[in-house]
């Protein structure tokens, strides 16, 4: 509860700081703002956005931009997930969520390789799965089909990376943020299925903050 409240306060501070920025800066930082509010980025990560996006970080962002963002703290530890992911890994709960929902997969040797970097086409595939698309049924072959579909949905907006290039943490955050305003596999704006409002092509941060505040208020206080 304390961690969630601190995340809420951080999100409020970030949102307030946006009020004094020019419109162009607000737009470019909307993804980071929303990801921070939802717990997809730590304060440290938000200050190191030029670092390469890793698979562990991608799992955390995917979970933050999903309906499972509020359930991770209640899952607890369930033993070793992969040969290189212990239960006490900071990414363990997010990796488990991402794999169980089919957004990501491990490797045939029993590893997950959480520190491996993520390319544009890999991130696009993850985002498409998050949106409920069956990537195996897309017309064409990998990665052309995935990149084409991602472009059609607007997932690659404001991302200048090309096929085969490793994404930065900022680019990965932007790509998954773009998924919020895209149409999911059922033809709905994805953000609306999470209870968020969309205005002028961006997620209304006030609806995100309201969601977080309601969660905080509804949580019972633990006895000391």
At which residue positions do the language-model features occur?
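N-terminal propeptides
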Residues: 1-214, 218, 222
């Amino acid at each position: 509860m304390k961690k969630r409240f601190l995340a809420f306060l951080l999100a409020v501070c970030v949102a307030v700081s946006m009020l004094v920025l020019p419109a162009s800066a607000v737009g470019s930082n909307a993804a980071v703002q929303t990801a921070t509010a939802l717990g997809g980025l730590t304060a440290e990560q938000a200050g190191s956005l030029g670092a390469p996006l890793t698979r562990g970080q991608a799992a955390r962002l995917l979970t933050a931009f999903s309906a499972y963002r509020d359930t991770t703290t209640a899952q607890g530890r369930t033993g070793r997930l992969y040969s290189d992911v212990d239960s006490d890994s900071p990414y363990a709960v997010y990796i488990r969520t991402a794999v169980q929902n089919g957004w990501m997969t491990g490797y045939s040797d029993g590893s997950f390789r959480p520190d491996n970097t993520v390319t544009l086409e890999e991130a696009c595939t993850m985002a498409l799965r998050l949106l409920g698309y069956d990537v195996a049924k897309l017309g064409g072959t990998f990665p052309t089909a995935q990149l084409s579909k991602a472009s059609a949905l607007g997932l690659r907006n404001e991302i200048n990376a090309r096929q085969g290039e490793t994404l930065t943490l900022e680019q990965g955050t932007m790509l998954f943020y773009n998924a919020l305003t895209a149409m999911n596999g059922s033809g709905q704006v994805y953000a609306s299925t999470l209870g968020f409002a969309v205005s002028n092509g961006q997620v209304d941060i006030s609806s995100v903050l309201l969601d977080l505040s309601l969660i905080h208020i509804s949580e019972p206080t633990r006895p000391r």
